[in-house]
C-alpha cells in the first residue's frame, strides 16, 4: 500500500516536470480529450458493473422467494403479509392511529359548534313552546 502511494506521488511530480521541461503546448488539448474519453469509459464501466450487480441481486432474490414459497407450501404456512393484515382489524392501537390535520380539527370544531348551536336553538324553542302552552292554559278565552 505504501509503495502504491509513493509511486503515485512520485509519478505525479515526474509528470509535472516532464510537461514543464518538454514545453509541448499542443498536447494539452489532446490530454483533455484523452482525459474526457477515459472519464466516459470509466463512467460506462461503473454503470455496467452496477447493472450486473443489480441483476445478480434480483436473481438471488427471485431464488430466495421461490425457496421461501416452497417452504410455505410444504408446511402450509401463510405469508406474513396476510397475517399482518388481519391483526389491525382485531384490536386498533390508539398510538398508531392516523393523526388529524389542522384542517380536519377545524372542521370537527365547526361541526361541534354547529351541534351546540342546534342544541341551544332546540332548547330555546321548546322552552318558548312550553311557556306559550302555559300562558294559553291560564288565559282561557270564552
UniProtKB/Swiss-Prot annotation:
Q: How does it sit in the membrane?
A: Lipid-anchor
Localization (cell): Membrane
Q: Which Gene3D superfamilies match?
A: Single Helix bin
Q: Which domain of life is it from?
A: Eukaryota
Q: Which residues form the propeptide?
A: 140-142
- Give the residue ranges for region: Disordered: 13-70, 83-105
Q: Which GO terms describe its molecular function?
A: SNARE binding; syntaxin binding
Lipid-acceptor residues (S-farnesyl cysteine)? 139
**Where is the major localization of this protein?**
membrane
Q: Which UniProt keywords apply?
A: Coiled coil, Exocytosis, Lipoprotein, Membrane, Methylation, Neurotransmitter transport, Prenylation, Transport
Q: Which PANTHER family match?
A: COMPLEXIN
- Assembly, per entry: Binds to the SNARE core complex containing Snap25, synaptobrevin and Syx1A.
State what protein this is by name: Complexin
What organism is the protein native to?
Drosophila melanogaster (Fruit fly)
Amino acid at each position: 500500500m505504501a509503495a502504491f502511494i509513493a509511486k503515485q506521488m512520485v509519478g505525479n511530480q515526474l509528470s509535472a516536470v516532464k510537461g514543464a521541461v518538454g514545453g509541448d503546448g499542443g498536447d494539452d488539448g489532446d490530454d483533455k480529450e484523452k482525459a474526457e474519453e477515459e472519464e466516459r469509459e470509466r463512467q460506462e464501466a461503473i454503470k455496467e458493473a452496477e447493472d450486473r450487480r443489480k441483476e445478480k441481486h434480483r436473481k438471488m432474490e427471485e431464488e430466495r422467494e421461490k425457496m421461501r414459497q416452497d417452504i410455505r407450501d410444504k408446511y402450509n404456512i401463510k405469508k406474513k403479509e396476510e397475517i399482518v393484515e388481519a391483526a389491525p382489524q382485531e384490536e386498533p392501537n390508539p398510538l398508531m392511529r392516523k393523526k388529524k390535520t389542522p384542517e380536519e380539527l377545524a372542521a370537527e370544531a365547526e361541526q361541534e359548534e354547529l351541534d351546540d348551536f342546534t342544541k341551544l336553538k332546540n332548547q330555546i324553542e321548546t322552552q318558548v313552546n312550553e311557556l306559550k302552552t302555559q300562558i294559553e292554559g291560564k288565559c282561557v278565552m270564552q
